[in-house]
Amino acid sequence: MTQTQSTKTATATAIYSLTIAPACVLRGRSAIAQAGDAIARFGKRPLIVGGSNSLAATQPYLQPILQQQQLQSAETAYGKDCSERSLETLREAVQTHEADFIIGVGGGKALDSAKLVAHQCKIPIVTIPTSAATCAAWTALSNIYSEQGAFQYDVTLARCPDLLIPDYGLIQTAPQRTLVAGIGDAIAKWYEASVSSGHSEQTLIISAVQQARILRDILFQKSAAALKEPGSETWQEVTDATVLLAGVIGGIGGAQCRTVAAHAVHNGLTHLLASHGTLHGEKVAYGILVQLRLEEMLQNNQLAATARQQLLKFYTEIGLPQTLDNLGLGDITLTELQRATEIACNPNSDIHRLPFKVVPQQLMAAMVSTTAPVGELKIKN
């Protein structure tokens, strides 16, 4: 057998694990009120994990069905971040309550915490998002942060949640800013997947990339109208796009359809204390502009330049950040910015999935010129 034949055989027999979707999704207005039987099948002693605000917001929705199903529940706040210390506290809470399943409520960090502790304790997980800010309620992935809120690493989980309940009535109570951030996070799927996997010939990856393009188009077409009419059918469709469809793309694409520079920029910015007042999707949305600016400056990519101008118009329309100043980082020092770029360019960073090399100085130039007119500040490799 030749080396080429051996390689082809190895590739053909390789085993890939896909965690595409939650086992069940119950969505709709008042979905929680209809989910009693679906929740109760996981056990009798749920531990409800969330942030303090999310726990308070979901209590009127959850408590009636918990009482109806005669479930003995306990609540615990995950803390400020999905960190190793907070996960240790949550594992202790599982043992203390003798929980047989977890109900995660809240936004991205709360749900990541709930999913990961359920994974570690090998018990079922139900996710109930309180906003449309991320697709965390869907995915088999948790992001770990330091106690100071700086991104550290991510953990791939054995499966997606056992039950996902997007209740539009509950999600509508979240500040509109969370949906705007969710739009920013979701739309990044296209700009990152098309770069990291756009040339793949694998069926599922092609499908994931094309779904990301469809997701982008839905958000371009419907976001402004959705934000003007919270609770409307269009609003529900955009909510589905940010929470559900974004998760589908990650599930189908798997580990080979990954984030690129937009999330690398986000990860670097989390190491700056001044960035902690902004949401995940807001930093990612800004990171998309940085990624396109890099393609424009380092490759003279005119399609990237056009896409950046299109996004700037869209961001203005719905209120996504376009500059460091918009992120509340207008007064950071050069040293702080350099630190963020060095972290974003570390050897294991997603930024290296770009088809060209990026060094911190080039990234810094892109980060301070996201709104530059087309054709300005080209940099040669």
Where are these regions (language model features)?
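A glycine/threonine-rich phosphate-anchoring loop and its flanking beta-alpha core
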Residues: 23, 119-211
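A short, small-residue-rich loop immediately preceding and capping a beta-strand
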Residues: 94-132
